[in-house]
C-alpha cells in the first residue's frame, strides 16, 4: 500500500477510535440504555434522546463505511446499483420522501417508522454477520462493522422503546414490520449473484440508517428542544 493509502487508512482508524471513545464515555456503546432493565429505567427523556441520536449517527457512519468498502472491493464496474434501486425489503413502509416531508409528519408516526425500520433489520443483520464470516478473503473492516452494527441496532431499538414509553405512556408498538426474505440470495453458489445480493443489502442498510438518523434528530429537536434547534 502506498503512503497516501496508509495515511487515509490511519485517519479512518483514528476517527473510529475517537468516536468509539466518545460513545464509551457517554455510556452509549457496550452499556444498555437501561442497565437494570426496561421496567426500572431511571434515565431522563433528554438523556435517552441524546444517547439514541449518538447511536443512530454512529450506525449510519458504520453503514456508509461498510458499503463503501464492499463497493470498492467487489462491485467496481459490475452495475449492481441498477439492481439495488427500489428493491429494499423495507420499501413498503410509508416513509417521508425527504426531510421536509418528515418535518410535517406527526411525532407518533415518526417513532412508529423508526421502530418498524429497526425491527425489520434485526433478522437481516444477524444473517449478514453470519454470511460475511463465511466469505473468502472478506476484509476485516467489513466484518467488524457488520458485527458492531448488529449490536448497536439492538441497543437503539431498546432506547426507542424507552422513548416511546415516556413520550406516550402506556403505548405499545404493535404495528407489523417488513419481513426480510433475502437469505437464499446471500447463500447462492453463484458468486456474482451473491455479491449482488450483499451489495443490495448494504445499500438498503445505508439508506435506512440515514432515514432513522434523520427522523430521530427531528424528533429530538421537536420534543426536547421545542423545535428551537
Curated annotation (Swiss-Prot):
Q: Which GO terms describe its cellular component?
A: extracellular space
Q: Name one GO biological process term.
A: positive regulation of fatty acid biosynthetic process
**Annotated SUPFAM superfamilies:** 4-helical cytokines
Does this entry carry the keyword Secreted? yes
Cellular compartment(s): Secreted
Q: Which residues carry this modification: Phosphoserine?
A: 56, 64, 120
InterPro entries, A to Z: 4_helix_cytokine-like_core, Somatotropin/Prolactin, Somatotropin_CS
Region forming the signal peptide = 1-30
Q: Which UniProt keywords apply?
A: Disulfide bond, Hormone, Lactation, Phosphoprotein, Secreted, Signal
| UniProt GO MF annotations | hormone activity; prolactin receptor binding
Q: List the disulfide bonds.
A: 34-41, 88-204, 221-229
> Any idea what job this protein has?
Prolactin acts primarily on the mammary gland by promoting lactation.
Q: Partners and quaternary state? A: Interacts with PRLR.
Q: Which family does it belong to?
A: Belongs to the somatotropin/prolactin family.
Q: What is this protein called?
A: Prolactin
Q: Which organism is it from?
A: Capra hircus
| Phylogenetic classification of the source organism | Eukaryota, Metazoa, Chordata, Craniata, Vertebrata
Q: Gene for this protein?
A: PRL
Amino acid at each position: 500500500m502506498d503512503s497516501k493509502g496508509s495515511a487515509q487508512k490511519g485517519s479512518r482508524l483514528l476517527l473510529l477510535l475517537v468516536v468509539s471513545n466518545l460513545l464509551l464515555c457517554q455510556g452509549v456503546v457496550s452499556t444498555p440504555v437501561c442497565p437494570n432493565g426496561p421496567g426500572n429505567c431511571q434515565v431522563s427523556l433528554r438523556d435517552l434522546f441524546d444517547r439514541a441520536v449518538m447511536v443512530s449517527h454512529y450506525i449510519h457512519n458504520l453503514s456508509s463505511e461498510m458499503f463503501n468498502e464492499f463497493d470498492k472491493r467487489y462491485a467496481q464496474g459490475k452495475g449492481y446499483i441498477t439492481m439495488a434501486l427500489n428493491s429494499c425489503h423495507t420499501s413498503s413502509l410509508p416513509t417521508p420522501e425527504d426531510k421536509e416531508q418528515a418535518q410535517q409528519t406527526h411525532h407518533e408516526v415518526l417513532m412508529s417508522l423508526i421502530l418498524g425500520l429497526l425491527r425489520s433489520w434485526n433478522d437481516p443483520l444477524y444473517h449478514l454477520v453470519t454470511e460475511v464470516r463465511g466469505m473468502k478473503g472478506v476484509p476485516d473492516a467489513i466484518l467488524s462493522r457488520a458485527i458492531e452494527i448488529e449490536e448497536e441496532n439492538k441497543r437503539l431499538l431498546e432506547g426507542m422503546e424507552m422513548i416511546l414509553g415516556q413520550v406516550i405512556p402506556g403505548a405499545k408498538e404493535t404495528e407489523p414490520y417488513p419481513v426480510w426474505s433475502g437469505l437464499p440470495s446471500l447463500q447462492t453458489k453463484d458468486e456474482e449473484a451473491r455479491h449482488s445480493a450483499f451489495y443490495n443489502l448494504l445499500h438498503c442498510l445505508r439508506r435506512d440508517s440515514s432515514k432513522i438518523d434523520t427522523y430521530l434528530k427531528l424528533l429530538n429537536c421537536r420534543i426536547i428542544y421545542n423545535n428551537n434547534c
